[in-house]
Amino acid sequence: MSSNSVKRAPTTATQRLKQDYLRIKKDPVPYICAEPLPSNILEWHYVVRGPEMTPYEGGYYHGKLIFPREFPFKPPSIYMITPNGRFKCNTRLCLSITDFHPDTWNPAWSVSTILTGLLSFMVEKGPTLGSIETSDFTKRQLAAQSLVFNLKDKVFCELFPEVVEEIKQKQKAQDELSSRPQALPLPDVVPDGETHHGQHGLPLLNGHAPGAGPHLAGLQQANRHHGLLGGALANLFVIVGFAAFAYTVKYVLRSIAQE
């Protein structure tokens, strides 16, 4: 924070926001990071990382807090900049911790308290002024699109270089994953060192049958020869049996004629 930001804000607000900044650096808010503008300590920007098991998972949501000169005796206004499916963009949000409800504001609440309350309301579905209704599918689409959207924001990139690098690494991993060819499943694959038997009773060593191709072809050819030989023998037995039967009948008839 520069000396210019100190001069522009009243002493009380400046001192309090400095304390809150040190506190949030020492004890970060889960899923959220925040930075004041170097030129104006009364304007803070934040980034919400979409929590797991929510439609916002994988998304990055940039917004800002505008503190009044009377802070902490008056509440700030809150805006969301990144399309998210929960709040309108660049619109003052009506929450109990914002300037819409000065009567419920507590001067003891810090920037950490404000951001925690914002995240809590974001993952809920209760309506309020500045909120919108969208499906979980739409929220997931916006979460995926938030990466590219935020990288186009100059203020976002200047205030959150670590988050920018995190997003770029995630994009790189996604690109590498999508460019990989789809692996085709291998039949009869077993773990290394194990021996199983696949089709035709062939042993499988380390997932493959040794010499399976030539051996299988030989078995198939032998089976064909065996079938032809069996059919020929069956026909021969029928012919021999019929000849024996004819000879027997002829012998019986001859014996009867002699008597």
UniProtKB/Swiss-Prot annotation:
<dbReference type="GO" id="GO:0005789">
    <property type="term" value="C:endoplasmic reticulum membrane"/>
</dbReference>
<dbReference type="GO" id="GO:0085020">
    <property type="term" value="P:protein K6-linked ubiquitination"/>
</dbReference>
<comment type="function">
    <text>Catalyzes the covalent attachment of ubiquitin to other proteins. Seems to function in the selective degradation of misfolded membrane proteins from the endoplasmic reticulum (ERAD). In cooperation with the GATOR2 complex, catalyzes 'Lys-6'-linked ubiquitination of NPRL2.</text>
</comment>
<protein>
    <recommendedName>
        <fullName>Ubiquitin-conjugating enzyme E2 J2</fullName>
        <ecNumber>2.3.2.23</ecNumber>
    </recommendedName>
</protein>
<dbReference type="InterPro" id="IPR016135">
    <property type="entry name" value="UBQ-conjugating_enzyme/RWD"/>
</dbReference>
<dbReference type="GO" id="GO:0005783">
    <property type="term" value="C:endoplasmic reticulum"/>
</dbReference>
<dbReference type="InterPro" id="IPR050113">
    <property type="entry name" value="Ub_conjugating_enzyme"/>
</dbReference>
<feature type="topological domain" description="Cytoplasmic">
    <location>
        <begin position="1"/>
        <end position="226"/>
    </location>
</feature>
<comment type="pathway">
    <text>Protein modification; protein ubiquitination.</text>
</comment>
<keyword id="KW-0834">Unfolded protein response</keyword>
<keyword id="KW-0256">Endoplasmic reticulum</keyword>
<keyword id="KW-0833">Ubl conjugation pathway</keyword>
<dbReference type="GO" id="GO:0006986">
    <property type="term" value="P:response to unfolded protein"/>
</dbReference>
<keyword id="KW-1133">Transmembrane helix</keyword>
<dbReference type="Pfam" id="PF00179">
    <property type="entry name" value="UQ_con"/>
</dbReference>
<feature type="topological domain" description="Lumenal">
    <location>
        <begin position="248"/>
        <end position="259"/>
    </location>
</feature>
<keyword id="KW-0547">Nucleotide-binding</keyword>
<feature type="region of interest" description="Disordered">
    <location>
        <begin position="174"/>
        <end position="200"/>
    </location>
</feature>
<feature type="active site" description="Glycyl thioester intermediate">
    <location>
        <position position="94"/>
    </location>
</feature>
<dbReference type="InterPro" id="IPR000608">
    <property type="entry name" value="UBQ-conjugat_E2_core"/>
</dbReference>
<dbReference type="GO" id="GO:0000209">
    <property type="term" value="P:protein polyubiquitination"/>
</dbReference>
<dbReference type="GO" id="GO:0005524">
    <property type="term" value="F:ATP binding"/>
</dbReference>
<dbReference type="GO" id="GO:0005634">
    <property type="term" value="C:nucleus"/>
</dbReference>
<feature type="domain" description="UBC core">
    <location>
        <begin position="12"/>
        <end position="162"/>
    </location>
</feature>
<keyword id="KW-0472">Membrane</keyword>
<dbReference type="GO" id="GO:0036503">
    <property type="term" value="P:ERAD pathway"/>
</dbReference>
<keyword id="KW-0067">ATP-binding</keyword>
<feature type="transmembrane region" description="Helical; Anchor for type IV membrane protein">
    <location>
        <begin position="227"/>
        <end position="247"/>
    </location>
</feature>
<comment type="similarity">
    <text>Belongs to the ubiquitin-conjugating enzyme family.</text>
</comment>
<dbReference type="GO" id="GO:0061631">
    <property type="term" value="F:ubiquitin conjugating enzyme activity"/>
</dbReference>
<keyword id="KW-0812">Transmembrane</keyword>
<keyword id="KW-0808">Transferase</keyword>
